[in-house]
């Protein structure tokens, strides 16, 4: 990979320093400072605010493969973390082109100002295609991203920092990303020209308890849109506390970090919840937590799956869906025990993307059916979960699609 082009005379104001000693120079954007993180790439063309505020990206620097990011500005609605002030999302960002002036009727501010407010350190003006190709070849590297408007850097110290960081393996970041308190969620999905509406107390027909490992807002909105009263509880909530809320269904949320580390406290809770006949649905980290609770294993991926254009096959329907993905760990399909069926696979690399327990109202997926951003091919999974709740109540099933 090359640093700044040879014809550039501007002094670099940001550096990306990889653990192998590679130094990439560029122009600084967003917040100033230095942070250690894992570098990944995302292939989505749109939805950069939702990507950067997704708690699953905590501990990561996101490289956008699409060259023009920020030209529709930033707004106060396209946010996915529950507590924006806590900044539970990506810690760094890399763009090909500099951020232009925004042009969109929803824009409330320039993306650079928004990045500063979020504390996201950024770099632009580099060959993101070369960086992406490097990641595909070598895997997601540990790195340091640094931004100093004066362009003053201790490169050797940054190299040492990048090399010394242990990476995401073994890190329980769910305890950081979780909201830390129980609360009721009633905001419904966004509607054109109307914005967000709320679910009335009398309209709530079902009660879902969501274990928050770093949950995205749009997941909760889709539950509310199906007339579910959602109670969000912290990641370390006990099974007894969950069951005391008398849920009709239990949801295991997405989140960041190493599932094996989070599983040290989450797996025993889920195993106790599985002793009941309450329907259980998991997404992303929640899928991995469920797999661990059932006796399977998880593993670190080479380059991860990050984007809004990933093909997945649903073996339960035979259909191929284009979905959003964001994960750097995966369930080892060969470790799934007897009685647990693999329901979805990635058509990029064949990795596991879903499971269900035979004869039980329990299933999960690795991808993000709520999208935000991305296609809505998998929205039916929320109705599938609701139908498990309805079946338990003796109510007829709704059409999934």
UniProtKB/Swiss-Prot annotation:
Keywords: Amino-acid biosynthesis, Arginine biosynthesis, ATP-binding, Glutamine amidotransferase, Ligase, Nucleotide-binding, Pyrimidine biosynthesis. The active site is at 284 (nucleophile), 368, 370. L-glutamine binds at residues 56, 255, 257, 285, 288, 326, 328-329. Its EC number is 6.3.5.5. Belongs to the CarA family. PANTHER family: CARBAMOYL-PHOSPHATE SYNTHASE SMALL CHAIN, MULTIFUNCTIONAL TRYPTOPHAN BIOSYNTHESIS PROTEIN-RELATED. HAMAP family: CPSase_S_chain. Composed of two chains; the small (or glutamine) chain promotes the hydrolysis of glutamine to ammonia, which is used by the large (or ammonia) chain to synthesize carbamoyl phosphate. Tetramer of heterodimers (alpha,beta)4. Small subunit of the glutamine-dependent carbamoyl phosphate synthetase (CPSase). CPSase catalyzes the formation of carbamoyl phosphate from the ammonia moiety of glutamine, carbonate, and phosphate donated by ATP, constituting the first step of 2 biosynthetic pathways, one leading to arginine and/or urea and the other to pyrimidine nucleotides. The small subunit (glutamine amidotransferase) binds and cleaves glutamine to supply the large subunit with the substrate ammonia. This is Carbamoyl phosphate synthase small chain.
